C-alpha cells in the first residue's frame, strides 16, 4: 500500500543523504573523500565513484559499470532479464485487484527498459547475491504499490515541498507526493532524479505517473543511490534504508514483517536462500 508515512520516510532519508554530501572541494563542491559523479552529484557509492566519476576517490570501472543492463551487465551478479521472467513479474501484478490503475501501467518490458540504464543493479557480487537484490527490490515494490496496484500516493493533499531546499526549489502549483514503484517523493528527490534520468522532475513530477519506464527509472535511481550498497548487510538493512524510522526498532513490526514475507517468498521463487539479517 502507498501511504504518507512511508513516503515521508523516503523523503527524510534522501534529505539526510543530501545533507551529508555537498560541502567544499572540486567540481561538485564535495567534501574530501566524496566523489563527484558524472551527473555532478556528491557521494561515496559506485553510482558516484564508478563510471564517469569526475573527481574525488574515483574507482575505475565502478561496481557494475560496464554495458549489459537488463540482460547482463557489470562485474558478476544475476542476469536480470532471465530472472525477472513474465511469470515472475505478472505473478506479482496479477494479485492486484481488477480495478487497480497500475495493472495497465506497470509492465515487465518497462522495467527491463529502465534497468538498462542501471547496469549495477543486481551486479557487483555473486549470482546468488544478484538474485537476492532482485527479490529485495520487488519485495519493497510489492509492499509500496500493493502488488502494482497504485501508481500514485492515495492521499495527494500533501505537496511534499521542502521550501528550505534552494538547490531543488519547488515549482509553483506542483506536488511531490509519492509516485511510481517505490513512491518517490519530495522536491529534493524529484529534482536530481529528473536530472539524472532526463526529465524535469520539479516542473513536471507527474511524468513519473504517466510513463512506466520513467517510473521504474526513478525507483531504480533511488535504489542505486540509497539501497544497493547495503544489500550485503541483509534484507533488514534495506528496510532501514527505505523506511527505518517508522518500521525498524519495533516501531511497526507488522509492516516490517510484511516486507520480509514478500522477500522470502520471492527468494523461494528464485531458488536462493534469503540470507541472514532479515529484520531491523
Curated annotation (Swiss-Prot):
Regulation: Inactivated by l-ethyl-3-(3-dimethylaminopropyl)carbodiimide (EDC) in the absence of exogenous nucleophiles (e.g. GlcNAc4, GlcNAc3 and GlcNAc2). Not inhibited by tetra-N-acetylchitopentaose or modified chitotetraose substrate TMG-chitotriomycin-pMP, containing a free, non-acetylated glucosaminyl residue or a N-trimethylamino glucosamine (TMG) residue at the non-reducing terminus, respectively.
Glycosylated sites: 155, 277
PROSITE patterns named in the record: CHIT_BIND_I_1, CHIT_BIND_I_2, CHITINASE_19_1, CHITINASE_19_2
Active site (record annotation): 144
InterPro entries linked to this entry: Chitin-bd_1 (IPR001002), Chitin-binding_1_CS (IPR018371), Endochitinase-like_sf (IPR036861), Glyco_hydro_19 (IPR016283), Glyco_hydro_19_cat (IPR000726), Lysozyme-like_dom_sf (IPR023346)
Temperature and activity: Active between 50-70 degrees Celsius.
Residue ranges crossing the lipid bilayer per the database entry: none
A GO molecular-function descriptor: chitinase activity
GO BP annotation list: amino sugar metabolic process; cell wall macromolecule catabolic process; chitin catabolic process; defense response to fungus; polysaccharide catabolic process
Keywords, ordered alphabetically: Allergen, Carbohydrate metabolism, Chitin degradation, Chitin-binding, Disulfide bond, Glycoprotein, Glycosidase, Hydrolase, Plant defense, Polysaccharide degradation, Secreted, Signal
Family label: Belongs to the glycosyl hydrolase 19 family. Chitinase class IV subfamily.
Function per UniProt: Defense against chitin-containing fungal pathogens. Hydrolyzes glycol chitin and tetra-N-acetylchitotetraose in vitro. Its action is countered by fungal polyglycine hydrolases and fungalysin, that cleave the chitin-binding domain from the protein.
Protein name, UniProt field: Endochitinase A
Organism per entry: Zea mays
Amino acid at each position: 500500500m502507498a501511504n504518507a508515512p512511508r513516503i515521508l520516510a523516503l523523503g527524510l532519508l534522501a534529505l539526510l543523504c543530501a545533507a551529508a554530501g555537498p560541502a567544499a572541494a572540486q567540481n561538485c563542491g564535495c567534501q574530501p573523500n566524496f566523489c563527484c559523479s558524472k551527473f555532478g552529484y556528491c557521494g561515496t557509492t559506485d553510482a558516484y565513484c564508478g563510471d564517469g566519476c569526475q573527481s574525488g576517490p574515483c574507482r575505475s570501472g565502478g561496481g557494475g559499470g560496464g554495458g549489459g543492463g537488463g540482460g547482463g551487465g557489470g562485474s558478476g551478479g544475476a542476469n536480470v532479464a532471465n530472472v525477472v521472467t513474465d511469470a515472475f513479474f505478472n505473478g506479482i501484478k496479477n494479485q492486484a485487484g481488477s480495478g487497480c490503475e497500475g495493472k495497465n501501467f506497470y509492465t515487465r518490458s518497462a522495467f527491463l527498459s529502465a534497468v538498462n540504464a542501471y547496469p549495477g543493479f543486481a551486479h557487483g557480487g555473486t549470482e546468488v547475491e544478484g538474485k537476492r537484490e532482485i527479490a529485495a527490490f520487488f519485495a519493497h515494490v510489492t509492499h509500496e504499490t500493493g502488488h502494482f496496484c497504485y501508481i500514485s500516493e492515495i492521499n495527494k493533499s500533501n505537496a511534499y515541498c521542502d521550501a528550505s531546499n534552494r538547490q531543488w526549489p519547488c515549482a509553483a502549483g506542483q506536488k511531490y507526493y509519492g509516485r511510481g514503484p517505490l513512491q518517490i517523493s519530495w522536491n529534493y528527490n524529484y529534482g536530481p532524479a529528473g536530472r539524472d534520468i532526463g526529465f524535469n522532475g520539479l516542473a513536471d513530477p507527474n511524468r513519473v505517473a504517466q510513463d512506466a519506464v520513467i517510473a521504474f527509472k526513478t525507483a531504480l535511481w533511488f535504489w542505486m543511490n540509497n539501497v544497493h550498497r547495503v544489500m550485503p548487510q541483509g534484507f533488514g538493512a534495506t528496510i532501514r534504508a527505505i523506511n527505518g524510522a517508522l518500521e525498524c526498532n519495533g516501531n511497526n513490526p507488522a509492516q516490517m514483517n510484511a516486507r520480509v514475507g514478500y522477500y522470502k517468498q520471492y527468494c523461494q521463487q528464485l531458488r536462493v536462500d534469503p540470507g541472514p539479517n532479515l529484520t531491523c
